[in-house]
Amino acid sequence: MRNFARYSAVKDLSMKQTFLYAVCGVILVTAFSGCAGINSLLKSGQPELIYSKALEYYQKEKWSRASTLFEGVQHYYIGTPREDSVSFFNARCKFKNRDYDTASALFDDFRRKFGRSAFIEDAEGMYALCFYYLSPGPSRDQTMTGQALIAINEFMSRYPHSDRVENFKQINGELTQRLHDKSYLNAYTYYKIGRYKSAIVSLKNALKQFPDSNHREEIMYMIVDASYRFANNSIANKQTDRYLSMLDSYLSFKEEFPESKYTKEVDRMAKHARDYLDRNKKDEDKDNNI
């Protein structure tokens, strides 16, 4: 009985493997057939046939195959009324395949060559979206975010009534916030590792660049704290000026956030700074009276 069960299990496994091999074989044959068909088309020298098949793949959303054919037929249509169509469809295939680097280059080329094309609005919209999709999180370099913002704002200025505008407004807010976060993270890094002078400069720049940042309260608190620590760690003849600067930051913070969760901490720092300044003034008065 055990031998029979073992035989049945082995037989079932063998049948499953055979089925999988058959499926894989069909997939490979189909793929090779598709490639062979595309290569034959490209070698046929019949641009109308190639273009027609490219459109067929395009409509079926087989982006890679469509792109291969559009690229292969493109040179036949240079200088003809169909040139912009081939260029646009090929760029959109790259976009749909999430090859945003290539798509952005193709759309950029398209918008420079075919400014009067019926596809120009869509091309410029997808050109902007390429940079949006290439834009990384705030912890990484934000060059693409900057390019996305430029392209998106140019699009909204050029096509104020486009269906894309509402979506682009949301994206604009999202990307701007990403730059806020990047600026904040850069400043916070200096603060966290104890480079308080650099932190103060970076934090103040962050506020200057993005006055409406949702990190504003925390940034202003860190300016007070970094200024306090910077003054506290300074040599004696630098401390007075640095504590005075810290108190300026403290007063700005208190004026803007009188009910802040950081109130007790900044009040404690301010008291210490004032106590130091009072003691220092008394010492100076004594020296002057001698």
Predicted features along the sequence, with ranges:
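Acidic, polar-rich low-complexity tracts and alpha-helical solenoid repeat scaffolds
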Residues: 4-9, 19, 31-290
